[in-house]
A protein has these predicted regions:
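Acidic/aromatic-lined carbohydrate-recognition and catalytic surfaces
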Residues: 1-41, 56-92
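Domain-wide signal for the mature, well-folded portions of proteins, strongly enriched
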Residues: 17, 32, 46, 50-51, ...
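Short, acidic/polar
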Residues: 38-52, 209-216
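Conserved alpha/beta catalytic core and glycan-binding cleft of carbohydrate-active enzymes
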Residues: 55, 67-223
Length: 223
């Protein structure tokens, strides 16, 4: 934010943030939601704006968007794109790659990624000991599509955090005015023996071990 006494300029602050991240060798992927009522040209214009004006490295597209049109847009050829429904898009050979060479990008150039909850939910089920999950886990670990990469995660911005995952069997959003109706009920979590914050050392140790197991499974999925 702005220093005390200075006028706030969110646009300038965000651009400064992006520059600082890039200077540190980090990339920035923002999340944008479209509800399906926007025209394809409007959606493309929005993505172009963020890429050209703010120099973001990628966009996580949530909701409904014309993915096939977006992929073919030349102004977005170097933008990393994360989305859910790539299986519904006809991808031509090479569309998952950046228009720049490996040397120019200093990386593999892969830019399209599937961002779905399947890995997270199946791995959480396996983590808490649900039966019949071994085959699903093996499929996720071996999964490496030729066209679209897979982004695996054990928690994201929509739902339980990693600590919530080992601390609660059910969501508890009673105090936010939504009467606990907001958020998904399907979190595949396990509280390790007691709901919410505890002081029992055995439960705390088990939760810590489960967190380590979760991060280990995530790491293995990328090897």
């Amino acid at each position: 934010g702005a220093a005390p006494g200075q006028k706030k300029d969110p646009v300038k602050e965000f651009k400064t943030l992006v520059k600082a991240l890039h200077k540190a060798g980090l990339e920035l992927v923002i999340e944008l939601y479209f509800d399906g009522t926007q025209s394809p040209s409007y959606v493309v214009d929005v993505l172009r704006f963020w890429a050209a004006e703010y120099h973001v490295d990628g966009i996580h597209i949530v909701g409904y968007a014309p993915l096939e049109t977006i992929v073919k847009d030349p102004y977005l050829a170097d933008l990393k794109l994360w989305a859910k429904n790539w299986d519904e898009v006809r991808l031509e050979k090479g569309t998952d790659r950046s228009s720049r060479s490996k040397e120019e990008k200093k990386g593999p150039g892969r830019r399209l990624s599937a961002y779905e909850t399947g890995f997270m939910l199946d791995m959480r089920s396996f983590l808490k000991g649900d039966e019949g999950m071994l085959n699903q886990v093996a499929l996720h670990v071996k999964d490496n599509p030729d066209t679209v990469a897979s982004i695996n995660y054990m928690a994201n911005t929509n739902g339980f955090t990693l600590l919530d995952m080992v601390s609660y069997d059910h969501k508890h959003n009673e105090d936010n005015g939504e009467e606990n109706h907001d958020g998904t009920d399907y979190n595949q979590s396990w509280n390790c023996g007691a709901e919410g914050p505890v002081r029992k050392k055995k439960i705390l140790a088990l939760r810590k071990r489960q967190l380590k197991n979760a991060l280990t499974m995530l790491s293995v999925s990328y090897t």
